[in-house]
Amino acid sequence: MNVRDVMKSFHIQDTLNKKVWEEDKTLNKNVRKILLKVSQKFIKDWNIDKKVKIQDIRFTGSLAAYNWSKYSDIDLHIIVQYKDLNKDLNLVARFFTLMKAYWNIKHDIKIDGYEIEVYVEDVSEKHTATGLYSVLEDKWIKEPEPTDAVFDEDDVMTKSKYFFNLYNDILLKKYKEGKYSEVIQVIEKTKEKIRKMRSSGLARGGEFSTENLVFKVLRRTDLLGKMNDLITKSTDKKLSETKKM
């Protein structure tokens, strides 16, 4: 997928997505029903003894705004209070990250071609989203407004190319040379760098910050997926070497 082709998807639409939203900008009843069922199933799969109060179930991301495209997915956030589960909030966050990954491996649920991405979020986490809808309450928390998509295309291109070059010229080379530990280490550091970069961009410049758009380019061109695959392959190679010893 060409980077410039992906960037064309960042333009603003005239309306919210009509497959998801009604004319009065409320969530389509069937869509809401599916999202509630998906949430209930996901929560059930946690399989934890302690009863967790669900604070809210929220729909956010580009499909809850005017910058949706064919690349969009449905970001479904289940809001809980982490400290209700454990005082170690980092432990709780890691648990839910693993649950999300496990869920995505097991399930491939889509609504009109749009994949549902389920997340668990602490109630204290701040939102920078353009649009935020409570699926539980069936109302907008923050209703989006159409706005001009102003961003520095050249800057997005330059920063995106850095990560493509890192993957093609360094990571693949190290993998072919059998430097599997280095591959894993570099990718883990790179993923953390991308995560921090996106968070700071959203906080400072919102949806159309260079950092957030770079993240979208990396995701929509599947570079992030390729990095994850390379971690898996490198880990398998390391384990195979251990067995031979």
Language-model regions: role of each:
Residues 4-72, 80-245:
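Catalytic core of pol beta-like nucleotidyltransferases
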